[in-house]
Every structure is written in C-alpha cells, then in structure tokens.
C-alpha cells in the first residue's frame, strides 16, 4: 500500500495526512478548522474578483425586477 498524501495545515503549517480517517482535513485539528472559519466570517479571507466583475453583475442593462 502506498504512503498517504501529506499536506500542510493551512492555519498552522503542521503536517496532515490526507486520509478518509482525518475528519479535519486539510486542517490538523478542529481548532485550526475553526480559526479558518472565523477568518472567513471576519472577512479576512476574500475570493479575488476582477474590479469590473461587480459592475457587470449589477449592470443597468438588466431589466428592473418586479416587486
């Protein structure tokens, strides 16, 4: 049987075995998983978007919605 893949925990950098038995993957612990969740909730992490993508999304060319 081959060695399981080992990755770094995104929060603390500890080595983590990527196996089905590790319920916290890619994190090393529940604590690191919750720290990451808190960072997303506090908007410390963001998904990059091009500056004009929001303009296209909310374009005035769209018909007004019926209320």
From Swiss-Prot:
An example Gene Ontology biological process: regulation of DNA-templated transcription
Superkingdom assignment: Bacteria
Positions bound to Zn(2+): 9, 12, 28, 32
Pfam families documented for this protein: YacG (PF03884)
InterPro entries xref list: DNA_gyrase_inhibitor_YacG, Znf_NHR/GATA
Alphabetical keyword list: Metal-binding, Zinc
Record carries keyword Zinc: yes
GO molecular function, one term: zinc ion binding
Positions of the UniProt region annotated as Disordered: 48-67
Cofactor: Zn(2+)
Gene3D superfamilies: Erythroid Transcription Factor GATA-1, subunit A (3.30.50.10)
RNA-binding in keyword set: no
Cofactor: record remark: Binds 1 zinc ion.
Family named by the database record: Belongs to the DNA gyrase inhibitor YacG family.
Subunit architecture: Interacts with GyrB.
HAMAP family in UniProt: DNA_gyrase_inhibitor_YacG
Function: Inhibits all the catalytic activities of DNA gyrase by preventing its interaction with DNA. Acts by binding directly to the C-terminal domain of GyrB, which probably disrupts DNA binding by the gyrase.
Record protein name field: DNA gyrase inhibitor YacG
Source organism: Pseudomonas fluorescens (strain ATCC BAA-477 / NRRL B-23932 / Pf-5)
């Amino acid at each position: 049987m081959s060695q399981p893949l080992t990755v770094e925990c995104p929060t603390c950098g500890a080595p983590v075995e990527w196996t089905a038995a590790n319920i916290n993957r890619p994190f090393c612990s529940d604590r690191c998983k919750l720290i990451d969740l808190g960072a997303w909730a506090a908007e410390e992490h963001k998904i990059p978007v091009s500056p004009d993508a929001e303009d296209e999304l909310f374009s005035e060319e769209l018909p007004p919605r019926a209320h």
